[in-house]
């Protein structure tokens, strides 16, 4: 396997079949390795996991502070690298997360906005882009043209489920099953029929906007919300914004 591949294991570690063998396999490579799990489902890593993975720990609200302390302390005790990811669905969640970060002096953290189907106003206020956001983002000529061809968020990523089904994006149907198809067949099908790797801003209303290729590649939020333009730009008058 190429060393520039990133391996990510997601889910409840206790339910991953033959986990020790999987770790032994991954340990043969110098590639980046991540474990992505919930702080509630977190299992104290076995000795084979020590210092091999970067742990990305998702935290949802309401937070069980006692369990969070147990999880973070177990990682610290084994000198594992970890980052806390707060799943934020409201301004109240954000403020509570900051209280925890400051009280427990958390150094490595991220805020991950979560769309619930009922918090579109929160997204419009805090996630949707303004014209100033778009224009203040630095970009090379190379990146400008890359965005016209591929999706920077999804390109090259595959998700292998426990039953062998392979998704280029878990929001779309499986492309193939790894037990019956080769990696070559998977890549060929995604390039020819898939919706993820080549998903760019060529749909309405983005295809009529002067900022079309300055914006980030479409993300999972566009799929979940069912809207292609998560911004406040008025395409008919780019100097005005839809607030």
What are these regions (language model features)?
Residues 25-29, 44-54, 68-79, 101-104:
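Acidic (Asp/Glu)-rich catalytic clusters
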């Amino acid at each position: 396997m190429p060393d520039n591949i990133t391996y990510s294991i997601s889910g409840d570690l206790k339910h991953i079949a033959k986990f020790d063998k999987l770790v032994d396999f991954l340990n043969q490579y110098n590639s980046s390795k991540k474990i992505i799990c919930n702080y509630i489902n977190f299992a104290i890593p076995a000795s084979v996991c020590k210092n091999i993975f970067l742990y990305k720990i998702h935290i949802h609200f309401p937070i069980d502070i006692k369990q969070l302390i147990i999880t973070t302390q177990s990682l610290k005790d084994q000198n594992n690298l970890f980052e806390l990811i707060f799943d934020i669905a409201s301004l109240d969640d954000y403020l509570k997360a900051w209280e925890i970060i400051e009280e427990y002096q958390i150094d490595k953290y991220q805020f991950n906005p979560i769309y619930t189907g009922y918090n579109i106003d929160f997204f419009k206020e805090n996630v949707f882009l303004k014209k100033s956001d778009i224009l203040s983002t630095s970009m090379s000529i190379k990146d400008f043209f890359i965005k016209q061809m591929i999706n920077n968020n999804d390109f090259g990523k595959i998700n292998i489920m426990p039953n062998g089904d392979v998704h280029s994006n878990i929001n779309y149907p499986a492309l193939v099953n790894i037990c019956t198809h080769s990696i070559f067949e998977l890549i060929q099908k995604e390039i020819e029929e898939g919706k993820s790797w080549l998903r760019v801003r060529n749909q309405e209303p983005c295809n009529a906007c002067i900022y079309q290729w300055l914006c980030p590649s479409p993300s999972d939020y566009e799929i979940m919300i069912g809207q292609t333009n998560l911004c406040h730009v008025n395409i008919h008058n780019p100097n005005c914004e839809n607030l």
